[in-house]
């Protein structure tokens, strides 16, 4: 079964969780991409509190009552690879996020690869960044099994404008990088999420990415933008056809 869902991350904090979900339902969507990432920060966010499980159960009851199943959710992306590339295990908030995803009745949890937030003119650091990510996601696999969740790895982009013209692509912006991460982790609990907007900003061929990923593609974030238009933030999440994605 395929669902057409909508995200609500851009407006959910301007109202209650229930009203934000009802807005998505009233717009005609049959499912929801729930922003656990938004509700996990800052420090007083619902997922940080002592009653976070109760909060998640309340969200699930709302989804059931209004008839809006949560078919995917987005994990936090607050962790980055340290400057000296020493390894750090996943923060505790990721375990909460994965359990909350299960409470919501959702199996597809979207993760960004963990990024190294420095300019990388060439690919010399790629092996260390790749090994770091493989190890990090390996640590999450027991939780994915415990909560019956599929980790969906989403292609990213140079959102901090660190790269300069002529530099190598940012890791995990290309189809091949993402496939190597999936194969490196080596688990049926890991698949791919294609964000068409991120791909467009990164100058990637979206249809070719779909063909390359084949059965590894589990979720699609279909959105548009104007491509790389630095120095502004390009990830506009426009409705398809309102940007320059072909």
Where in the sequence are the language-model features?
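N-terminal basic, low-complexity leaders that serve as flexible interaction/assembly modules and, when applicable
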Residues: 1-14, 25-26
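Hydrophobic faces of well-ordered beta-strands that scaffold small-molecule active sites
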Residues: 2-8, 32-34, 70-75, 109-111, ...
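Active-site beta-loop-alpha junctions enriched in small/polar residues
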Residues: 7-11, 35-39, 75-78, 114-116, ...
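Gly/Pro-rich active-site loop or hairpin
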Residues: 13-14, 21, 43, 50, ...
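Catalytic domains of carbohydrate-active enzymes, especially glycoside hydrolases
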Residues: 17-39, 100-108
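Structured loop/turn residues at beta-strand edges in well-structured enzyme cores
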Residues: 27-30, 68, 104, 188, ...
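Glycine-rich, proline-tolerant flexible connector loops at the mouths of alpha/beta enzymes
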Residues: 33-60, 119
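Active-site acidic/histidine proton-transfer and metal-coordination neighborhood
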Residues: 57, 62-66, 81-191, 201
């Amino acid at each position: 079964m395929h669902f057409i869902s909508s995200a609500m991350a851009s407006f959910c904090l301007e109202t209650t969780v229930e009203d934000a979900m009802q807005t998505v339902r009233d717009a005609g969507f049959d499912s929801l991409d729930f922003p656990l990432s938004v509700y996990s920060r800052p420090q007083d966010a619902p997922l940080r509190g002592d009653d976070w499980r109760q909060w998640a159960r309340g969200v699930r009851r709302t989804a059931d009552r209004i008839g809006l199943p949560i078919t995917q959710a987005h994990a936090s992306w607050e962790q980055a690879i340290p400057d000296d590339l020493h390894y750090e295990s996943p923060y505790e908030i990721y375990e909460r996020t994965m359990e909350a995803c299960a409470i919501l009745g959702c199996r597809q949890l979207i993760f960004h690869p963990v990024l190294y937030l420095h300019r990388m003119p060439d690919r010399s650091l790629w092996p260390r960044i790749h090994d770091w990510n493989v190890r990090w996601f390996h640590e999450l696999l027991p939780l994915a099994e415990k909560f019956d969740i599929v980790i969906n790895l989403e292609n990213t982009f140079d959102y901090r404008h660190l790269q300069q013209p002529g530099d190598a692509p940012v890791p995990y912006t290309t189809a091949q990088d993402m496939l190597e991460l999936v194969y490196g982790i080596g688990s049926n609990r890991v698949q791919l999420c294609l964000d068409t907007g991120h791909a467009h900003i990164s100058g990637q061929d979206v249809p070719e990415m779909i063909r390359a990923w084949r059965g590894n593609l589990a979720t699609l974030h279909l959105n548009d933008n104007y491509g790389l238009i630095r120095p502004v933030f390009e990830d506009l999440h426009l409705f398809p056809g309102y940007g320059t994605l072909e």
